[in-house]
Amino acid sequence: MNKEIQQANHSKNINKPFTDKDSIRVSVLSEALPYIQRFANKRIVIKYGGSAMADKTLQNAVFRDLALLSSVGVQIVVVHGGGPEINQWLEKLGIKPVFLDGLRITDTETMDVVEMVLTGRVNKQIVSGINNHGRLAVGLCGIDGGLIEARTLGGGSHGLVGEVAKVNTKILSPLLEEGYVPVISSVANSSDGRSHNINADTVAGELAAALGAEKLILLTDTPGILRNENDPSSLIEKIRLSEARELIDQGIVKAGMKPKVECCIRSLAQGVNAAHIIDGRTPHSLLLEVFTDAGIGTMVMGRG
């Protein structure tokens, strides 16, 4: 009886009219094909942060997107932040977060919390999420394998906040070639062995440059670069490198967006083909950027 029911349902599906929604699905798949072919065996570095980390539905969408990208042969590297969870733990411990120029001021006590949260909690949650969708992710931080060497930022006005002094990609290349997805937290040691908190956008940009990545993609809580930060309709869809610098000089790009645009500029200046600032609050924004003609967010182009 069950077999007869299955056969009947199969016959119904065969005879079911082809709808406009079906046409859209086929069109989307067809549109994706040249991009799948183009980015097979190419490297894309993705900075994962913002609301896409806090909302469970968005989390799952990102993990699925990452698994799909890896499944079709794109060599994915994920660099993650963890600001909201860091703030939650600092609050639990009675430590007030302080920021300067969009970067967290990090004393020794705060650094202990940052390292615990990023490497011990957030990193493993992301690895587990990707693994649950059928791909093999590997959790790392900048300390592992000497991946990143930190240097204290400026004159130490931000405390144990670092910048990237050196990148050693030897640990990453074999993992990527074997189809693993490295998931990297932005904690690294300086030459004197002290742990530093490096802005995750900065780490993503420097890794993209060192790996010769095709793309750098930053997931954010904004539609992209806005000429007016209070007006989503002022989105700049494409911008040249020189124009991005001008927006910083003019004070249009500021606060938390400033380090994001600066890391795009540095990565492009070092050979990355394109950098994208996209809205991680939009479900499957990664796939929309990589596999569609229109893309999403702001594309910063390397020439000009």
UniProtKB/Swiss-Prot annotation:
Protein name (record): Acetylglutamate kinase
Residues marked Transition state stabilizer (site): K47, K260
NCBIfam families xrefs: argB
Functional pathway: Amino-acid biosynthesis; L-arginine biosynthesis; N(2)-acetyl-L-ornithine from L-glutamate: step 2/4
Matches recorded under HAMAP family: ArgB
Taxon lineage: Bacteria, Bacillati, Cyanobacteriota, Cyanophyceae, Synechococcales
GO molecular function ontology, one term from the record: acetylglutamate kinase activity
Gene that this sequence comes from: argB
Protein's GO biological process: arginine biosynthetic process via ornithine; L-arginine biosynthetic process
InterPro entries on file: AceGlu_kinase-like_sf, AcgluKinase_fam, ArgB, Asp/Glu/Uridylate_kinase, Glu/AcGlu_kinase, NAGK-C
Catalytically driven reaction(s): N-acetyl-L-glutamate + ATP = N-acetyl-L-glutamyl 5-phosphate + ADP
CDD domains on file: AAK_NAGK-C
Superkingdom to which the source organism belongs: Bacteria
UniProt keyword annotations, A-Z: Amino-acid biosynthesis, Arginine biosynthesis, ATP-binding, Cytoplasm, Kinase, Nucleotide-binding, Transferase
Subcellular location: Cytoplasm
Source organism of the structure: Prochlorococcus marinus (strain NATL1A)
